[in-house]
Curated annotation (Swiss-Prot):
Belongs to the intron maturase 2 family. MatK subfamily. GO terms for molecular function: RNA binding. Keywords: Chloroplast, mRNA processing, Plastid, RNA-binding, tRNA processing. InterPro entries: Domain_X (IPR024937), Maturase_MatK (IPR002866), Maturase_MatK_N (IPR024942). It comes from the Eukaryota. The keyword tRNA processing applies. The keyword Chloroplast applies. It is found in: Plastid, Chloroplast. It comes from Empetrum nigrum. One of its GO terms (cellular component) is chloroplast. This is Maturase K. The gene is matK.
Length: 506
């Protein structure tokens, strides 16, 4: 008991991260600015130009802090351009730079914790751990032995203040948190940045990095309690529930039946040996070898944890209990399923031979065509029926740029969905993008598609050869004659760290 408490105190002592002085360092905003120009996967190019000044950002921060302590409301208006002026400059642009700089600052303590976690340990390189594709070999290895899955849509916080309160537990820097809270409350636009779309959690494109950090940290906080209980499950019988309540005492000190009533039953749930949890953004999977009764207990536990300790309202329809043998999982752009594959084995015993029919479980991954068509429709590459359309906004570009953009999109999609067991859906996407490219070029040159393709020849097709096709022929040269068997192979990559968003590709 005492040893366990000391471990908690040690963890707590490492969380006094004072980041307030970094907010006034110019190199922080230069780093955020460079990330924007380099079109980082987390931070889009927000339209900076040579007129932006780090000195103005620093002065604006000082001015805002003065206004904060004098309780003078300095409101950023989204409509009145005259109100958005500071020293003759647009405060809207510089407020975005402040948020992006703040995102860089608050990430530093957690990045240092990651480095200390990986230091001195024989682990896979961190960039390999970040790959989305690394989860599918894990599925293939584990899912065939499991029975039930909880398909979870994680609820969203009802107010931005909850996100700040969660961050307060790790960053014991009151000045930084006051400044953050001041930004969130005084800028009306930020209050409407978090929206709910079809029971999922989404952010507006502006300052996405900062709010994604707050939300992911909020989710990781509840996950840390989940993992904490899981890892200590074999020692819990000698530990009182108050120990666990200390970790979240900054929310509310209450005695909830989640930890106090029928505590032995809760411990039994955590001691389930075949239990796996995965999450990406606002969707999570909890897979177990147990029964439906056990999964219902997990559902009850998660709902109570979200609602009573993290003030995240959860509805029953956000958590579904499914049997793996009868259900396909829609996760990370793939339809994953476990199906029975018949297997015939011939057995020979002296003079007699007979056939034994067995059924083995096989993990399959397929690319769903309907969501991909919807993404192409949203990006205006085709209509709702899947018929290719021209891209008028790209007609002003050069021919090589147009072809490169279409080819780049398809190469990204083909690269990401290389793990699909069947490639017919990719062929259809390739057809749509190729014909959309031809329509765009024909529109630019004021010609028909037939005449343009006749003049261009097969040159257009060469841009749509993917790296995956080259990898297939280099990896499996002997199978080049049997294309059907060749394209049923799956390849998982360790350099994919995000899902491509066609709608935002401009």
């Amino acid at each position: 008991m005492e040893k366990f408490k000391r471990s908690l105190e040690l963890e707590r002592s490492q969380q006094h991260n004072f980041i307030y002085p970094l907010i006034f360092q110019e190199y922080i905003y230069a780093l955020a600015h460079d990330r924007g120009l380099n079109r980082s996967i987390f931070l889009e190019n927000m339209g900076y130009d040579n007129k932006s000044s780090l000195l103005i950002v620093k002065r604006l921060i000082t001015y805002l802090i003065t206004q904060m302590y004098q309780q003078n409301h300095f409101i950023f208006s989204g409509n009145d351009s005259n109100q958005n002026k500071f020293l003759g400059y647009n405060t809207k642009l510089y407020s975005q730079m402040i948020f992006e700089g703040f995102a860089v600052v608050v990430e530093i303590p957690f990045y240092l914790r990651l480095l200390s976690f990986l230091e001195g340990k024989e682990r896979v390189k961190s960039h390999n751990l970040r790959s989305i594709h690394s989860i599918f070999p894990f599925f293939e290895d584990k899912f065939s032995h499991l029975n039930y899955v909880l398909d979870i849509l994680i609820p969203h916080p009802i107010h931005l203040e909850i996100l700040v309160q969660t961050l307060r537990y790790w960053v014991k820097d009151a000045s930084s948190l006051h400044l953050l809270r001041f930004f969130l409350h005084e800028y009306p636009i930020w209050n409407s940045l978090i929206t709910q779309k079809k029971s999922s959690f989404s952010f507006s494109k502006r300052n996405q990095r900062f709010f994604l950090f707050l939300y992911n940290f909020h989710v990781c906080e509840y996950e840390s309690i989940f993992v904490f209980l899981r890892n200590q499950s074999y020692h819990l019988r000698s530990i009182s529930s108050e120990t666990f309540l200390e970790r979240i005492s900054f929310y509310k000190k209450i005695e909830l039946e989640l930890f106090t009533k029928d505590f032995k039953a809760i411990l039994w749930v955590f001691k389930e040996p075949f239990l796996h949890y995965v999450r990406y953004r606002g969707k999570a999977l909890l897979v177990s070898k147990g029964t439906s009764l056990l999964m219902n207990k997990w559902k009850y536990y998660l709902v109570n944890l979200w609602q009573c300790y993290f003030y995240m309202w959860s509805q029953p329809r956000r958590i579904h209990i499914n049997q793996l043998a009868n259900h396909s999982l829609d996760f990370l752009g793939y339809l994953s399923s476990v199906r029975l594959k018949p297997l015939m084995v011939r057995s020979q015993m002296i003079e007699n031979s007979f056939l034994i029919e067995n059924a083995i479980k096989k993990f399959d991954t397929l690319m769903p065509i309907t969501p991909m068509i919807e993404s192409l429709v949203k990006a205006k590459f085709c209509n709702v029926l899947g018929h290719p359309m021209s891209k008028p906004v790209w007609a002003a570009l050069s021919d090589s740029d147009i072809i490169e953009r279409f080819g780049h999109i398809y190469r990204n999609l083909s690269h990401y969905h290389s793990g699909s067991l069947k490639k017919m859906s990719l062929y259809r996407i390739k057809y749509i993008l190729r014909l959309s490219c031809a329509r765009t070029l024909a529109r630019k040159h004021k010609s028909t598609i037939r005449a343009f393709l006749k003049r261009l020849g097969v040159g257009l097709l060469e841009e749509f050869f993917t790296e995956e096709e080259q990898v297939f022929y280099l990896t499996f040269p002997k199978a080049s004659s049997t294309s059907g068997e060749l394209y049923r192979r799956r390849i998982w990559y360790l350099d994919i760290i995000c899902i491509n968003d066609l709608a935002n590709y401009e």
